[in-house]
C-alpha cells in the first residue's frame, strides 16, 4: 500500500491508561507492514486545547439552554447546568482567544496532512467500564477535571473539524473491545471511509485484530430480571423518590 500514516497515543495532551497504550501499539505494529509509511506525528498541541474545548462547548450550551437555565433551571440536569454556568463566567476575550486557538489547531492538523493520508490514535483512554458508571472519573491515575474530560482523545479532533471514525479492532488485554480512531483530511470523508474499509478487510482474518463479535449464546440468558425497572441514569437499582419508574425503553 502507498498509504502514509501518522500515529499518536495521546496527542501529547491527553491522559491514557496503560492497557489502552499497549493495545494501540499492537495495532500500530500491525499497520507498519501494510503501509508505505507509519511514524509518530507531533501535532504540537498544548494543554490549551482543553480550555479551548471548554469554552466552545460552554458557548454552545449557553446558546441551546440559556433560556431554560434562566427560567426553569430545575428542568436541566446537573451536567447541562454546569456547562451553562461555565459559560456565564466566560468573557468576550476568552471567546476571542478560543476561536483563534481553534483556528491554529485546525492549521496544525492541515499541515500534518500535507505529509500523511491518515492519522490514527486510540478512541478512548480507558478500557470499557460498567454501564452503571456514567463516565470515567480518572484516567491513568489522573482525576477527570469534569464529566467529559475523559473524551479528550476525540474532542481534540473535533476542534480541528476533521472527519474521524472508530474502527472496531480486536480486544485489549482485559478482553474488552478496542477501537482505533482513524482521522482523515478535512472534507476527506469518503477517502477516510475507504481507508477504514480497507483496514477492516485486511484484518478480518486475524482474530486479534478483527471486529469483535458478541457471543450471542452467552448473552442469551440474562443475569438479571429484565422485567424489573431499569433506571437511567442508574441509581443503584433504585428509583429516586417521587420520580416514578423510569425505564430504559
What are these regions (language model features)?
Residues 36-53, 82-86:
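Short connector loops at secondary-structure junctions
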Residues 1-14, 25-30, 34, 90, ...:
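Structural helix-boundary/capping segments
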Residues 144-167:
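Small-aliphatic-rich amphipathic alpha-helix that forms the alpha element of a beta-alpha
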Residues 97, 129-150:
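Short, surface-exposed loop/helix-turn segments at secondary-structure junctions
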Amino acid at each position: 500500500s502507498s498509504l502514509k500514516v501518522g500515529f499518536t497515543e495521546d496527542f501529547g495532551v491527553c491522559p491514557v491508561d496503560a492497557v489502552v497504550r499497549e493495545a494501540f501499539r499492537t495495532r500500530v505494529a500491525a499497520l507498519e507492514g501494510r503501509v508505505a509509511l507509519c511514524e509518530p506525528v507531533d501535532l504540537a498541541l498544548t494543554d490549551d486545547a482543553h480550555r479551548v474545548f471548554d469554552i466552545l462547548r460552554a458557548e454552545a450550551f449557553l446558546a441551546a439552554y440559556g433560556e431554560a437555565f434562566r427560567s426553569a433551571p430545575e428542568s436541566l440536569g446537573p451536567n447541562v447546568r454546569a456547562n451553562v454556568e461555565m459559560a456565564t463566567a466566560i468573557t468576550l476575550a476568552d471567546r476571542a482567544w478560543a476561536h483563534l486557538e481553534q483556528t491554529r489547531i485546525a492549521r496544525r492538523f492541515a499541515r500534518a496532512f500535507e505529509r500523511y493520508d491518515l492519522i490514527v490514535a486510540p478512541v478512548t483512554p480507558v478500557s470499557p467500564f460498567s454501564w452503571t458508571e456514567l463516565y470515567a472519573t480518572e484516567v491513568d491515575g489522573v482525576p477527570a477535571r469534569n464529566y467529559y474530560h475523559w473524551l479528550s482523545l476525540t474532542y481534540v479532533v473535533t476542534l480541528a473539524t476533521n472527519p474521524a471514525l472508530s474502527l472496531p479492532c480486536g480486544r485489549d488485554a482485559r478482553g474488552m473491545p478496542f477501537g482505533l480512531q482513524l482521522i482523515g483530511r478535512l472534507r476527506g470523508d469518503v477517502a477516510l471511509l475507504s481507508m477504514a474499509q480497507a483496514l477492516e478487510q485486511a484484518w478480518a482474518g486475524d482474530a486479534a485484530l478483527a471486529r469483535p463479535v458478541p457471543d450471542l449464546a452467552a448473552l442469551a440468558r440474562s443475569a438479571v430480571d429484565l422485567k424489573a425497572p431499569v433506571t437511567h441514569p442508574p441509581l443503584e437499582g433504585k428509583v429516586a423518590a417521587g420520580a416514578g419508574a423510569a425505564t430504559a425503553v
